[in-house]
Curated annotation (Swiss-Prot):
It comes from Listeria monocytogenes serotype 4a (strain HCC23). Residues 231-251 are annotated as: Linker. It holds the Pfam family Hexapep. This is Bifunctional protein GlmU. Mg(2+) binds at residues 103, 228. Acetyl-CoA binds at residues 386-387, 423, 440. GO terms for cellular component: cytoplasm; membrane. The gene is glmU. Residues 1-230 are annotated as: Pyrophosphorylase. Residues 252-457 are annotated as: N-acetyltransferase. GO terms for biological process: cell morphogenesis; cell wall organization; lipid A biosynthetic process; peptidoglycan biosynthetic process; regulation of cell shape; UDP-N-acetylglucosamine biosynthetic process. Pathway: Nucleotide-sugar biosynthesis; UDP-N-acetyl-alpha-D-glucosamine biosynthesis; N-acetyl-alpha-D-glucosamine 1-phosphate from alpha-D-glucosamine 6-phosphate (route II): step 2/2; Nucleotide-sugar biosynthesis; UDP-N-acetyl-alpha-D-glucosamine biosynthesis; UDP-N-acetyl-alpha-D-glucosamine from N-acetyl-alpha-D-glucosamine 1-phosphate: step 1/1; Bacterial outer membrane biogenesis; LPS lipid A biosynthesis.
Amino acid sequence: MSKRYAVVLAAGQGTRMKSKLYKVLHPVCGKPMVEHVVDQISTLNVDKVVTIVGHGAEKVQEHLAGKSEFVKQEEQLGTAHAVLQAKAELAGKDGVTLVVCGDTPLIEASTMEALLKYHHEKRAKATILTTVIEDPTGYGRIIRDDLGIVEKIVEHKDATEKEQRISEINTGTYCFDNKALFEALENVSNDNVQGEYYLPDVIKILKDSDEVVAAYRMESFEESLGVNDRIALAEASKLMQRRINENHMRNGVTLVNPESTYIDIDVKIGQDTVIEPGVMLRGKTVIGDDCVVTSGSEIVNSVIGERVHVRTSSIFESKVGDDVQIGPYAHLRPESDIHDNVKIGNYVETKKAVVGEGTKLPHFIYMGDAEIGKNVNVGCGSIAVNYDGKNKAKTIIGDNVFVGCNSNLIAPVKVGDRAFIAAGSTITKDVPDDALGIARAKQDNKLGYAKHLNHGK
């Protein structure tokens, strides 16, 4: 098999986005659009990927580190000029080169593989990826002769009335014989209104040299959707989300209302898990089998075990074991590690907390910088007081401990195994194993005193 190369065009400034963020770094379902493109290319056994960068080059290189080589286009002088910047890396090499736009996040590896195969079958020097759309206004048209052979690409503004009625368009993705590409690029002129060097002119140069130019027509226009403004970004995100959600449903996940469920592309979900409407699953979240995530929940970069029930709660950068009940309205902040068979109830917040197997935090609890053992019960209103205004400190609770309601554990403090903390206590010293910790003022009843108080009656 001949060598394969790819050039990704990612140097455009994207002024229509009206954003400080470099255009191709705008995310589509949790991943920058240019990274979608490069990740798809990486599955094609490509020998080298060269990304042409311009504005925001450093940020693009950060995101694609290890996935691509980079060449900077100092001046944005058109698509042909952009590809020519890869001359030092690719010119003179045998093989074929894919040219793909970095702002087409929906393009799939299977389509590019089909393009490469068609290019090889036709023994072409260039093959254009095309598609047919109802309204081709603004797109370059593919002009074929009576035998269906490609004659040229005509830009919309230069097309005759007859040519404007053609619905087959140039998607901006190409496959070239690598040597022929770079030889032709040297002859591209900028004799046009914009004074730029355009890649479609390579097609004309090759045709004028009697080289074979082919066109592979793909089924779906959506793969070629280029993102140039926020409206197109929203459309691309919508189409990508539908693709992601349908893939999860095909793999055994129930999405009660897919249209209102947001799932990033790197999220993994196990079979027979049910995701209710209004759920957001972000980053590299992994959810096991047989879970339920109810409406209003957000889970970000977290690992969730099997048979977990998350009720209208937020989980960030945390780990949850099997058979755990969470919520409603719980908040697991980063570095929470919740073991199996734990109950995290309503209005419970954890942060940098390890919660041992079988432990119950039923409601209105804060546990930050805490290590909690197995089979512990923490009463309503209890707090691990971890911050003294300058420093954070740790609370350690052993196994089989009972913490009464409205208890304050002033860190650093350790509560031993099987200890009992009396309700309303403020614990400032360690509590030994099997001990009762109690720290509250003695109750004093003032008999008859209430008669002197004004109760408003």
